[in-house]
Amino acid sequence: MPYPPNYGGVIDVFYKIKSLHAIGIKIILHCFKYGREEQEILNSLCEAVYYYERKLNPTKLFSSKPFISITRNHPELLKNLLKDGHPILFEGLHSCFFLDNNALNQRYKMVRMHNIEWQYYKGLLKGEKSFVKKLYFNWELKKLKSYESILSKADKILTISGKDQYYYNIRFPEKTILLNCFHKNDTIRRNNETKPFCLYHGNLSVPENIQAALYIAKKIAPKVNVPIIIAGKDPSKLIVDEIKKHKNISL
């Protein structure tokens, strides 16, 4: 569900929709309801919006396909995709369950890669304390790495950074295009601030970002004289408590 746009992947999706709408591209949006409700603003930007329930069946953990993909295997999604012959943009590896479906062989298919998913899960694994969650992340990252082969069925792979572009271009030469993140800002405003400062921004409730923020607070802040701003949504209590110990950090 690409609204509200309050974290990385959703920011890119929502402002991509806005940008395409602004230049007259008609959009049929398919999205899964996963902790978010239907949003009227999407109806104003799209020709049609289809919503699907994501079924988090624990037995699907034992599938050879990644849990984040197989739980988006909805028959109505494929049925609706087959109503027309338009190009299809798959947002993220997790949305690619039907990418290799024979019924879509004649369609022009693009995949937007928001990251290297298995490497992201590797980071989650390193930052996780729970033994059960560690097992899950370790299992999933192996499946995600193998699952990348499905990208061979895409006509184009749209990467979000130079690092990702390099990685995917080695695996899928001639398919990859670097397309940087879509975001809210369409103008550059000069910063008249005379004093330098450091900014760290991210989702402050996920383990790897919590660790990064704590590292900045404990290891970097005591050694520098410039103000440090740590910004993001849902800050962990660990971050809040640590920042209180440092005069040069604000949240």
Model-derived regions: residue spans:
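N-terminal subdomain of nucleotide-sugar transferases
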Residues: 1-49, 83
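A short, charged, and often flexible helix/loop element on the N-terminal side
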Residues: 49-78, 129-137
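Membrane-proximal helix-turn-helix segments that form the acceptor-binding/catalytic region
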Residues: 15-18, 78-82, 117-120, 128-157
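Short N-terminal targeting/anchoring amphipathic segment
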Residues: 79-97, 108-110, 156
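Conserved catalytic-core segment of nucleotide-activated headgroup transferases in glycan assembly
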Residues: 12, 170, 178-247, 251
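Donor nucleotide-sugar binding/catalytic pocket of nucleotide-sugar-dependent glycosyltransferases
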Residues: 110, 137-188
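Active-site proximal beta-strand in glycosyltransferases
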Residues: 88, 104-128
